């Protein structure tokens, strides 16, 4: 009986390296990212035993309470990215400032959320590690620490996410598609599957925090009222988990602006999700899967020029017919 040899993630990347003229530097960078994800998953699985599930007792730059796993995941990713020696600068949700690494010899900027949905950790529910990668301009000298890293999503060459601890992760490569991998426990052997959003509206799902419906704008509330019965409703409460479902079933994930809250301090007219390491990441993956993403002005997410490294945005991401409909609504 012939032996079946599973494909390794490195084999997959090498095939694409040859086909799309990618360099070995990218392979080294991706190896550091997948190693970081493995370490995060290990700490997640053993968190209760090692006392890593509580609060860290600090507040991050977003004004959010930090959990111990947030700090652990951030430290892990920063360590492996620095060890790769291929990264110029890093923007992390958990780091107030830009993190300099190899400004002279590095080739990539990396944007990441080390532990999306960390409030799920204590309940054993899925969390995510999201990342986006942009390449240094070949003719570029560093303009300065405050602007060179501020790249549009259209400048990204890759983006991906790990859904921890499911053993599944997604990687989108520019002009080469969006791929989901089912990995073994070592994340060495993988089963790649190209993701394309389904065309059948009967499969589509609608995902958003329904508890906030009354504080959305009138336009958004009206659209929900008309369309909520057309699609199945699913909401996990972690961007990585909800977007993972979206890639499988199609439809729409949205995080609208909050503009009608009884307490004006709770309003978020600019949106909640961060552009560089959340919205751009899922927008990039969705585009490579045949979808699109916009903000609440109808502007494509990947065309937004960031003004700051923790800039927030509204987000509507999913199947193109729905996104086109919403873009027309917002621009009207």
From Swiss-Prot:
Keywords: Carbohydrate metabolism, Cytoplasm, Hydrolase, Magnesium, Metal-binding
Cited SUPFAM superfamilies: Carbohydrate phosphatase (SSF56655)
Classification via Pfam families: FBPase (PF00316), FBPase_C (PF18913)
Chief localisation class: cytoplasm
Co-factor requirement: Mg(2+)
Note on how the cofactor is bound: Binds 2 magnesium ions per subunit.
Catalytic activity: beta-D-fructose 1,6-bisphosphate + H2O = beta-D-fructose 6-phosphate + phosphate
GO CC terms of this entry: cytoplasm
HAMAP family recorded: FBPase_class1 (MF_01855)
Family from the record: Belongs to the FBPase class 1 family.
Name of the protein this chain belongs to: Fructose-1,6-bisphosphatase class 1
Species name: Syntrophus aciditrophicus (strain SB)
Lineage of origin: Bacteria, Pseudomonadati, Thermodesulfobacteriota, Syntrophia, Syntrophales
